[in-house]
């Protein structure tokens, strides 16, 4: 269950150093940018960390307290909004608990197919990052010092207008991302996440994952449990009812699943398209009219959604990509039998 998306559905993310410093850099300085990104992914999933994360888009900013705990092969995290409402997400394994103090409600469910951690920082990239030099260029440079830590800055530059660019400031010792910028075609920053303070302790007590507010008297709801996803790594396992007939270069169908929506007569189909770095989720839902949920573009930070009606079905494509990408995918969706499998399955 992705609480960011589910929350929306309920009406509710020293610049240069001298040669003497360079001589003191670890051997990782010679690594390729792609290797650093792979280390970053490992750090986010396997390190203990706690800190204050600031998410900014436009003139808006949200601040949250993030705790990530690893115990053997198990991981858990707690994300608490540092505002007057104090909404909270607690993930233990695949179980996600969303606490809404303002609504006196707790929603318990499972992580959506392809979803990573609950933190907006972890959700920037797919679970299995794949690199393709046809669509991105990668570079590494000194990133200076952030929150007292020396960093490398990794630049991921898109080669066309269908995807965003990224700048990643990674801790040189651990590859932990301390700052992330998502940039548009004109290089303007559409979203930024950064730690204003962070610690990486050897251990974090289990009590740190306890809800910060009492849920006594709250209404508890258990959301629908997603079916096990089918992935396009096994073509014979993929039987989607819908497919995109036109895709931006490099995007392929990665995941397909369906789930029963509360109050709905038919299951909602969920398709995930990705180029290995950027991802677009497509939701196809029956029984919803255009008047209930307007067609067109909606935005939240770097995320762009495009909604269209298709033969009585509501189609919504959403992802941290330019609008033209979500619009292309949403508008080209067709019944699966009308679209050749080879168009969107990875070779």
Model-derived features: where do they sit?
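Acidic/charged, solvent-exposed loop-and-adjacent secondary-structure segments enriched in E/D, K/R, S/T
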Residues: 100-123
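N-terminal mature ectodomain segment of secretory-pathway/periplasmic proteins
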Residues: 30-104, 134-172, 176-183
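Bacterial N-terminal signal peptides that target proteins for export
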Residues: 2-15
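Surface-exposed amphipathic alpha-helical segments
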Residues: 174-176, 187-206, 316-347
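Short, solvent-exposed recognition patches
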Residues: 219-311, 323-328
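N-terminal signal peptide c-region/cleavage motif recognized by signal peptidases
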Residues: 24-26
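Pro/Ala/Gly-rich low-complexity, hydrophilic intrinsically disordered segments
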Residues: 194, 202-233
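A short, surface-exposed interaction/processing loop segment used at functional sites
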Residues: 183-192, 196, 294-318
């Amino acid at each position: 269950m992705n609480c960011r998306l589910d929350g929306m559905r309920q009406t509710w993310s020293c610049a240069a150093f001298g040669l003497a410093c360079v001589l003191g850099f670890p051997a990782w300085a010679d690594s390729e940018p792609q290797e650093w990104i792979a280390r970053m992914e490992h750090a986010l999933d396997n390190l203990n960390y706690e800190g204050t994360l600031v998410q900014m888009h436009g003139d808006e900013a949200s601040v949250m307290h993030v705790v990530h705990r690893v115990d053997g092969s198990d991981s858990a995290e707690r994300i608490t909004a540092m505002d007057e409402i104090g909404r909270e997400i607690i993930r233990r394994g695949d179980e996600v608990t969303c606490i809404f103090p303002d609504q006196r409600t707790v929603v318990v469910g499972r992580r959506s197919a392809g979803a990573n951690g609950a933190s907006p920082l972890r959700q920037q990239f797919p679970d299995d990052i794949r690199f393709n030099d046809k669509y991105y260029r990668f570079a590494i440079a000194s990133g200076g010092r952030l929150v007292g830590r020396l960093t490398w800055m990794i630049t991921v530059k898109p080669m066309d207008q269908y995807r965003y660019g990224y700048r990643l400031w990674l801790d040189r010792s651990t590859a932990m991302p301390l700052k992330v910028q998502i940039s548009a075609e004109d290089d303007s920053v559409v979203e930024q996440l950064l730690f204003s303070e962070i610690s990486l302790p050897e251990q974090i007590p289990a009590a740190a994952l306890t809800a910060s507010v009492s849920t006594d008297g709250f209404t508890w709801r258990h959301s629908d449990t997603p079916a096990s996803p089918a992935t396009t790594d096994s073509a014979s396992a993929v039987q989607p009812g819908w497919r995109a007939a036109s895709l931006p270069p490099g995007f392929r169908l990665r995941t397909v699943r369906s789930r029963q929506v509360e109050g709905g007569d038919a299951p909602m189909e969920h398709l995930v398209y990705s180029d290995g770095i950027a991802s677009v989720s497509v939701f196809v839902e029956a029984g919803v009219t255009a008047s209930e949920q307007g067609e067109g573009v909606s935005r939240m930070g770097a995320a762009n959604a495009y909604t269209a009606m298709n033969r009585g079905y509501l189609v919504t494509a959403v992802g941290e990509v330019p609008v033209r990408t979500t619009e292309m995918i949403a508008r080209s969706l067709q019944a699966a039998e009308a679209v050749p499998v080879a168009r969107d399955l990875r070779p």
